[in-house]
Every structure is written in structure tokens, then in C-alpha cells.
Design a protein with these regions (language model features):
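Short Gly/aromatic-enriched secondary-structure transition segments
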Residues: 72-75
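Structural motif
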Residues: 60-62
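Classical protein tyrosine phosphatase
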Residues: 69
Length: 274
């Protein structure tokens, strides 16, 4: 379908994965004329779409020349959080990385701001340079409401009893976080999941993992908890893996989704700004 903004059409269609499957969330926006800039789309309109569809992919638009212009754009969405590294995180592989975020490791599912007092409502990703199709590095998103809908009654009962405690020391912070696995959206009250996924057990190559503890369940139920969460969060109806193209802009509902990253080839030209 088309939406008309300032007499210029924007094409809207459901987001689909590379196999053509349509998850229960996500919307693709494409320009209706050549050279249309992302900044021509009203931020309030995009925020409404993001709250309804949880993940927006803006593809084919002219985008941002630098981090400063991306930051100015993001101010239209609300207050921009200032992290220890500034407003924009440059996600690019670093030689001798001391944290998995800056390596070419996979990154398990998590939510941003989990160690902060205020969790940002939205994330904005801009792809400066995309890796090759065979290089890996897709960003993964999982809808927690969809996962809750996919769970059976015994899984839901287990999730509702469980809570997670996490501790992490990274380049920019060291902190602890605790949250029940099943929680209410902080603004809209519907159920969501708050889950920080551990890395693959026994993976010695994973750089600087967090510490993970789960309360409210018996120790022998930890494996069942993790397996059931992964089953639902990685179900095709709840999960989307995004292969980047240069100048893609992705707006994610950070209060509703979890996100992560697939591993990518060493020195692949993968550069995102978030």
C-alpha cells in the first residue's frame, strides 16, 4: 500500500525474511520517488508505526552523511540518550577487541539499556557499510509478544516464575541488572519478555560474557527455561534476521523487541551507527 506525505508516496509492505516468510511484526518502507530523504518522513508518524509494528526498515532512501546528522535526526524522536561513548555507537570490528560488541562474534539476544535506570524506547540503526551477502553479520530481532503467544501453558507458567540477574563489565560501564522474565510494558501494560540470552555454553571464544543467574525456579529447570525461551524467540513468526544494505535505516521498538547479531567474517566491511 502507499502512504502519501507532502504529495509524495511512500510504499509500505510487511517485512519478510530471506525465505519470504512473514513474521508477526515489522514493516518495510520504500520511497515513491528517486532521491527521497529519510528526513522527509515525519518523526511522529514513524513513531506511531514503530509502536504498532515494532520494527521499521527504511530502504532505498537517501540517508545521513555522518554521526552528527544522524543525531540531529534522532532528536525528533525524543530525548537522545547520552552513553559514556556519546550519542552514537559506531559498531565496527576493532582489532584486539575486549568486548564481543566490537569483535566479529555473534551477540545473543538482549535489550539495550538493561543496565541503566532508563531504558530507551527506540533504537535507530544506520548502515554505513554493509557486509557481503556471504559475510554474515545479520542483526537479529525477536518479538517478545509473539514469543509469549507461541508458548504453551507449561512454558508460560515456568517463565512467570523465573527472573534473571545479570552482571556485566564492559568498556563503557560495569553494572548489574535484575528483571522478571515476564513483565509489563512500562508504558502500555501488555506483557513482554525481559531476557538476556547467555552465549553458547562452553564457548571459550566469546569475549567478555555477562554473568547469568535465574531465580524463582529450581536449578535443574535452568536448561528447560533457556530452551523454551529460545524455541519461541527464534520461531519464524517471532524472529527476523536482517541482512544489511548500505544506507538502510532501521527503527526498533526496544521496549518490546530483543535484538542480537550473527557472527560475521573477520574484517568484513560491516559498519553500523546506532
Amino acid at each position: 500500500m502507499n502512504a502519501y506525505l507532502s504529495d509524495q508516496p511512500v510504499r509500505l509492505s510487511p517485512l519478510r525474511d530471506e525465505q519470504g516468510n512473514q513474521p508477526r511484526f515489522g514493516l518495510l518502507l520504500e520511497p515513491g520517488r528517486p532521491g527521497m530523504h529519510v528526513g522527509e518522513l515525519p518523526a511522529q508518524w514513524l513513531k506511531g508505526l514503530a509502536r504498532s509494528h515494532h520494527l521499521l526498515l527504511l530502504r532505498g532512501f537517501a540517508a545521513f552523511a555522518d554521526a552528527e546528522s544522524l543525531t540531529r535526526y534522532c532528536h525528533d524522536f525524543g530525548e537522545v540518550m547520552l552513553w559514556p561513548f556519546g550519542a552514537v555507537l559506531e559498531l565496527v570490528e576493532q582489532e584486539g577487541a575486549e568486548d564481543h560488541i566490537f569483535a566479529n562474534n555473534y551477540v545473543p539476544l538482549h535489550w539495550d539499556g538493561m543496565y541503566l535506570e532508563t531504558v530507551p524506547e527506540f533504537q535507530v540503526f544506520h548502515c554505513v557499510d554493509a557486509p557481503g551477502d556471504s559475510d554474515g553479520g545479520r542483526t537479529t530481532f525477536s518479538s517478545t509478544p509473539a514469543a509469549l503467544q507461541l508458548a504453551d501453558s507449561s512454558e508460560l507458567e515456568l517463565w512467570r516464575r523465573a527472573s534473571g540477574r545479570y552482571q556485566r563489565s564492559a568498556a563503557h560501564y560495569s553494572s548489574r541488572s535484575a528483571a522478571p522474565i515476564v513483565e509489563r510494558h512500562p508504558r502500555r501494560e501488555f506483557p513482554i519478555l525481559r531476557f538476556c540470552e547467555p552465549p553458547v555454553e562452553g564457548d571459550a571464544s566469546f569475549i567478555n560474557p555477562s554473568e547469568f543467574h535465574y531465580d524463582g525456579i529450581a536449578p535443574e529447570q535452568r536448561g528447560e527455561l533457556l530452551a523454551s525461551l529460545r524455541r519461541c524467540l527464534y520461531h519464524p513468526q517471532a524472529h527476523y534476521a536482517h541482512r544489511w544494505r548500505s544506507d538502510d535505516l532501521v527503527i526498533a521498538d526496544n521496549l518490546t523487541l530483543l535484538h542480537g547479531r550473527e557472527a560475521f567474517a573477520h574484517r568484513a566491511p560491516r559498519h553500523l551507527r546506532r
